[in-house]
From Swiss-Prot:
InterPro entries in UniProt: Ribosomal_uS8, Ribosomal_uS8_CS, Ribosomal_uS8_sf
Protein's UniProt name: Small ribosomal subunit protein uS8
Highest taxon listed in the record's lineage: Bacteria
Assembly behavior: Part of the 30S ribosomal subunit. Contacts proteins S5 and S12.
Keyword rRNA-binding assigned: yes
UniProt KW keywords: Ribonucleoprotein, Ribosomal protein, RNA-binding, rRNA-binding
Pfam families, per database record: Ribosomal_S8
GO cellular component, one term: ribosome
UniProt source species: Rhizobium rhizogenes (strain K84 / ATCC BAA-868) (Agrobacterium radiobacter)
Signal peptide extent: none
Length: 132
């Protein structure tokens, strides 16, 4: 069965794993998913991730979730731009999450980055997801 929203599937796996207090979750690998995980790791929302190669052309991302005092660092994570409704913003209209406590992850011409990096580089793009 084909997956219509691979990024949304990864975010759901992270959300479900965090709610069940799992130490790690796995998801099929792709370049976009890895770039989003790079941003999540740089911003301190996950411990890290590793690529597990099965040798038959398929690989998987093993994501290590992060907890602080028994509760997940990720309180909310959700998809903004969906396959049926893409959301694009200019640099001036990049939204804030929880008055700046959370982040927006954008796909820009300069790569996948957090909202504050996009403002610094003066670039807009597609709003992939929000994390708080």
């Amino acid at each position: 069965m084909t997956m219509t929203d691979p990024l949304g599937d990864m975010l759901t796996r992270i959300r479900n794993g965090a709610s069940r207090r799992k130490s790690s979750v796995s998801t099929p690998a792709s370049k976009l998913r890895a770039r989003v995980l790079d941003v999540l790791q740089a911003e301190g929302y996950i411990r890290g991730y590793s690529v597990v190669d099965f040798g038959n052309g398929k690989s998987e991302l093993s994501i290590e979730l992060k907890y602080y005092e028994g509760s997940s660092v990720i309180r909310e994570i959700g998809r903004v731009s969906k396959p049926g409704r893409r959301v694009y913003v200019s640099v001036k209209s990049i939204p804030q999450v929880a008055n700046g406590l959370g982040i927006i992850i954008l796909s820009t011409p300069k790569g996948v980055m957090a909202d504050h990096q996009a403002r610094e580089q003066n670039v807009g793009g597609e709003v992939l997801c929000s994390v708080f």
